[in-house]
Amino acid sequence: MQGIDVSYSDEVGFLTKGDRDWEDWIMQLLLMAKKEIGKDNAQEMSINFVDEDRSQAINRDYRDKDRPTDVISFAIEDGDDGLDLSMFTQDPDFTEDIGDLFMCPSVIERHSKEYGTGFDREFGYTIVHGYLHLNCYDHIEPDEAKEMFGIQGKVLEEYGLPLYPDQLDEGRGK
């Protein structure tokens, strides 16, 4: 399995907080999710850490929801346009640009307290959730939600950040 090239923009200084190597931690979760969905080709993406004002502006402008949110994903390929990229992904030199994530650490922190999950589990949930959206997974329909949340749960459990059993249907939250 080839890797994921992640470029970062950190408007809030998140990556320098604490003594954790956030980029390494994020990469471990992304690679586990990539393996779980069976993606073998090289990928590239960006992760942008933003404040609540920027998160709210993006959410309002692109999703018509006037509130900050934990993660917003802009997938290059959403699966709805009928493009078959398989011929490209077989080329060992091809790197698939899957898109961009905009993450708001302060909203993730608030959610971790509201849901009683702890920051690490909530952050892990959010990064895997966003990554799956960039790979054409969604949770609008119940069967899609079951598949997507099942993948998230498996990845988080394997990493040591399990979803609680009562969260599997709704994805998170008690």
From Swiss-Prot:
<keyword id="KW-0698">rRNA processing</keyword>
<feature type="binding site">
    <location>
        <position position="133"/>
    </location>
    <ligand>
        <name>Zn(2+)</name>
    </ligand>
</feature>
<dbReference type="GO" id="GO:0006364">
    <property type="term" value="P:rRNA processing"/>
</dbReference>
<dbReference type="GO" id="GO:0005737">
    <property type="term" value="C:cytoplasm"/>
</dbReference>
<dbReference type="GO" id="GO:0008270">
    <property type="term" value="F:zinc ion binding"/>
</dbReference>
<keyword id="KW-0378">Hydrolase</keyword>
<keyword id="KW-0862">Zinc</keyword>
<keyword id="KW-0540">Nuclease</keyword>
<feature type="binding site">
    <location>
        <position position="129"/>
    </location>
    <ligand>
        <name>Zn(2+)</name>
    </ligand>
</feature>
<comment type="similarity">
    <text>Belongs to the endoribonuclease YbeY family.</text>
</comment>
<keyword id="KW-0255">Endonuclease</keyword>
<dbReference type="Pfam" id="PF02130">
    <property type="entry name" value="YbeY"/>
</dbReference>
<comment type="function">
    <text>Single strand-specific metallo-endoribonuclease involved in late-stage 70S ribosome quality control and in maturation of the 3' terminus of the 16S rRNA.</text>
</comment>
<keyword id="KW-0479">Metal-binding</keyword>
<dbReference type="InterPro" id="IPR023091">
    <property type="entry name" value="MetalPrtase_cat_dom_sf_prd"/>
</dbReference>
<dbReference type="GO" id="GO:0004222">
    <property type="term" value="F:metalloendopeptidase activity"/>
</dbReference>
<dbReference type="GO" id="GO:0004521">
    <property type="term" value="F:RNA endonuclease activity"/>
</dbReference>
<feature type="binding site">
    <location>
        <position position="139"/>
    </location>
    <ligand>
        <name>Zn(2+)</name>
    </ligand>
</feature>
<dbReference type="InterPro" id="IPR002036">
    <property type="entry name" value="YbeY"/>
</dbReference>
<keyword id="KW-0963">Cytoplasm</keyword>
<keyword id="KW-0690">Ribosome biogenesis</keyword>
<protein>
    <recommendedName>
        <fullName>Endoribonuclease YbeY</fullName>
        <ecNumber>3.1.-.-</ecNumber>
    </recommendedName>
</protein>
